[in-house]
Every structure is written in C-alpha cells, then in structure tokens.
From Swiss-Prot:
InterPro entries: ArgE/DapE_CS, Bact_exopeptidase_dim_dom, Peptidase_M20, Peptidase_M20_dimer, Peptidase_M20B. Its cofactor is Zn(2+). The keyword Zinc applies. The active site is at D82, E175 (proton acceptor). Zn(2+) 2 binds at D141, E176, H380. This is Peptidase T. GO terms for biological process: peptide catabolic process; proteolysis. It catalyses: Release of the N-terminal residue from a tripeptide. It comes from the Bacteria. GO terms for molecular function: metallopeptidase activity; tripeptide aminopeptidase activity; zinc ion binding.
Amino acid sequence: MTYDNLLNRFLTYTRVNTRSDESSETTPTTQSQVDFALTILKPEMKSIGLQNVHYLENGYLVGTLPANGNFPYKIGFIAHMDTADFNAEGVNPQIIDNYNGEIIQLGQTDFVLDPKEFPNLNNYLGQTLITTDGTTLLGSDDKSGIAEIMTAIDYLVKHPEIEHGEIRVGFGPDEEIGRGADQFDVEDFDVDFAYTVDGGPLGELQYETFSAAAAEIDFMGRNVHPGTAKNQMVNALQLAMDFHGQLPQEDRPEKTEGYQGFYHLLSLEGTVDAAHASYIIRDFDDEAFVSRKDFMQKIADKMNAHLGAERVQLQIYDQYYNMRKIIKKDMTCVKLAKKVMENLAIEPIIEPIRGGTDGSKISFMGLPTPNLFAGGENMHGRFEFVSLETMQRAVDVIIGIVCFKQ
C-alpha cells in the first residue's frame, strides 16, 4: 500500500543528527537523541493519537494505541533513535525515482553507488530509492523503522474501521553501541511479545543473533635501547602480534558467513613499552561461544608462562546472547509475522542476524522480541540506501500483525 506521509516523515528524521557516543557515560549518550525524542517524536506521537506517551529515564519514549477489537495479544514495536559511528551531521538525502539500474552519483562527491560493486541495487529496478549525498550516512538504521511504526499507527488511527489489538510503541537510544536495551523496562512496556523493526531487505524475519563478548588486552613490555636490547627488551607491540597470530586465521569476519563465528580485532595501539588491543568475539552456538573465550584465555596464560611474568592481561565481557534460546520456547511471535508476510505475498527470509539487536537483550529480560525488516541496505556509511517501496511493505506488515486474527 502507498502511504503518503511515509517519505516526508522519514526524511525529517534523517536530517537530525542522533549519532551515539561510545565514550559518553550518560544515558542516552548524546543530547541530540534526547532532543529528537522530546521535540520531534513525542509531539508527533501525541498528534497521531498515541496515548500515555511518556519519556523514561532510560531514554525510551513509549506510547500506546488501545485496542479497538477483541485480540489475544498486546504487541510492541521497537526502533532505535541513534545512528552508527559515521558522520551524521548535515544529512541531505537524495531521492532517485524509478531507479533504472545505472550508477548513482552521490551528491557532489566522487562517491557512487555502482551496481557492479553493490549488486543488491539490481533488486530495486523501477523503485524509489533514498540515498546519501556521499558526505554522511543516511540513518535508515533505524529511522526507517521509526517512520514505519509511526506511519502504521497514523494509518490505524485514521481508519478506525480496521480492528486491531493493543499496541505499544518504544523508541530507544544507543543501540548502535550496544547499550540501548540495558535498562529497558519490560514491566512498563507491558506486552505479550514485541518486534524490533531494525532489519534490512524485504522479508527479513530474524530470531537468532550472535552471542557476543568484548575482549580488552593490555600487553606490558619493557623498553630498553635497541642497541643493547638482546635478552632485555620485551616489545609490547610484538606481544600483541604474537597473540593475534595464534588466533585461527579463518575465524575472521571477512572469511566467515552464515552460522560461522569469529574473532575480530577492532583496534591495536601502543609502543614498545605498552600496547592495547580490543577484540569482539561472536558465535551462534553456546558451547562454541564459551570455547572461543576460553581459547583466548589459554593463549594469554601460555604467553605469560613463557614470559615468566603477567605481561598479557586479558579481560572479557559478555555483551549479549543469542535470543533463539528464549524465542524457541514460544514461537508465536515468529509464526504470526511469518503468516502475515505470506498473506501479503512477501517471502519471509528467516536467517540468523550476524550481529545483534536490542531484541537480543530484551528477549533475555523475558519479552520475546524478534526482528522485522525495515528496508535499509549498505548501512552505517555513505553508501547506505533504502527503497520507499520496501518501507511501505514494512508498514503493511506492522498493520497486518496487529490486525491478524487466527
């Protein structure tokens, strides 16, 4: 279905810089997210008919659309307000009508969207694409989701003849840095199950995520003059290289897919005297996840034993877990979304998320929360784009879910 206000709503959201900040200790991590919630989203939520709209200390903006029919479930929809760690100031979207399959120039920059480099463009011939101007990201992750949820609510309020169950809407902060759901209030949200609207292409329906951990490693060296260094110098950077060299070369993001896990070196910095490395660890299987963490610890222990001192100091922190374990207990939310997509002639793409969503943590709080497509492609950078037609289909799915009767 065509929704007249969807595009303008989305464009309005994208132009607000809501980039999160991992170095910040506040919640939300940036004031711009608070401003976006309170000055743009909250008034709009009230104006389209949501009730009990309130902003919580955890950074979530929540509202309710009461049921106007007899339905068995209260259902929530969640999207995040922040955008990824890429320039988000001065977002100036381009609209490409009736995409013809050719190269898309991104504003006045030298950057282009070339189907040879991005073959996913070929899935959108004849559609309306929204791209960046090459200087920023677009913010489709996850302002597409916000716009789709708001548009669905707006449509239902304007069409009271369409019966639906009780709907709760939640827009939260800091998903991109993994903190958004840490303080999510399940009791306040008060639904039977929920969906994050934070996926990619048409049809994505996901209830499996990585289990995730972060590893921080300090390497303690000993710096002496290189001319007299024999049997005295301990080069911290070399220790870091030695550590990394003992990890399986095939277990890296660029060499894995599907259900394969990995170790990912995010950063390495230092001097001869001291170095620091940051890793993330990812796997879908619980035992493999534990084994990966244990393997890193064994490398550190072996190196320290060889060095005769605690020169490799490893700390590992769990970040989130595969929500499959929770959702598998009751697949109602997945089966419902799958059925609705099929009724809409959308082929469900049920694959694991090689990442995480707020739904990962929220599911482990007792609220099953799988992920629905929102439409974004090439997310987190200047090559990001989204199809308006896919966004419209996402609105169709949201409406279909809350109106579905067995």
